[in-house]
Design a protein with these regions (language model features):
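C-terminal His-loop and adjacent cap/lid subdomain of alpha/beta-hydrolase
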Residues: 1-264
């Protein structure tokens, strides 16, 4: 909806000073120059998942695997950074993840008059069989909004960020672990405990934990894991893709995950 608004209504009425678009394309296209700063905020779901496919084939049923219903993804419509357009692609992220699920579920339960009134989209599809994505794209979104506000106020565009790598069929290129290559990399991708993906389980993405032997080989102690996450978090702060306060939430998460090292 906001993509269509910014691309059509904004051109004529010029009501807004900038746009933050956290969505896939509309009719296979993104937003071009509309005279104000536009920041496209993209997860794997918009690149190689259900939101990349709205014109690649109709999604008939959101409760069964996407791959059984639709054609391969379309070419990404966002293009290179240019003029008043910036694109942030968050590797490993999904459109709707664990942190957002916790927030929206609490809100929906509070507002619902009965359990039956809680929206079904808050339930991960049963076919998935994996936990919800844990990347925490909302933490990166906070930095993106910060940069957009500065851009609107000062006229200085934020630096370009690396894009997620795609093959000739517009599929995400993955490393030996199954993690997306390129893109903005949060601590769960730079210091992983498992595979976060945004192209599975419709909007929710997925998280598949590494074997405990693999985790201990990567991080022999809890402190070594905390150190790896802290280094990744501070690197993201330096790159401008996390605010310091949001970066420290990843460190707190790492400090709380001590169970892997019990008895070590």
């Amino acid at each position: 909806m906001l993509v269509a608004y910014s691309d059509i209504v904004q051109r004529e009425h010029k009501l807004f000073d900038g746009f933050f678009l956290h969505t896939g394309p509309v009719e296979g296209k993104g937003v071009d120059d509309v005279g104000v700063p536009v920041l496209h905020f993209i997860t794997e779901t918009e690149i190689d998942g259900i939101l990349a496919l709205e014109t690649g084939g109709a999604v008939l049923d959101y409760t069964v695997p996407v791959s059984t219903q639709i054609l391969p993804p379309l070419p990404p419509p966002y293009g290179a950074d240019r003029g008043l357009i910036r694109v942030w692609e968050v590797a490993g992220a999904s459109h709707f993840d664990k942190q957002l699920w916790a927030y929206t579920t609490a809100f929906a339960v509070r507002e619902a008059s009965s359990p039956a009134d809680v929206p079904i989209y808050l339930e991960q599809p049963l076919f998935c069989g994996l936990p919800i994505n844990e990347v925490g794209q909302g933490r990166v979104a906070a930095a993106a909004l910060h940069h957009l506000n500065k851009w609107v106020a000062s006229g200085r565009a934020p630096e370009s960020q690396p894009r997620i790598e795609l093959d000739e069929n517009y599929r995400i290129i993955r490393d030996a672990d199954g993690l997306a290559q390129g893109g903005i990399r949060t601590p769960p991708m730079a210091a992983p405990l498992g595979i976060n993906r945004g192209d599975e389980c419709t909007f929710w993405g997925s998280f598949q934990e590494f074997l405990i032997t693999d985790i201990l080989a990567r991080y022999p102690s809890h402190q070594s894991y905390i150190s790896a996450v802290t280094a990744a978090a501070m690197d993201s702060v330096g790159r401008g893709t996390l605010l310091y306060e949001e970066a420290m939430l990843y460190v707190e998460d790492a400090q709380a995950r001590s169970a892997y090292w019990f008895g070590q």
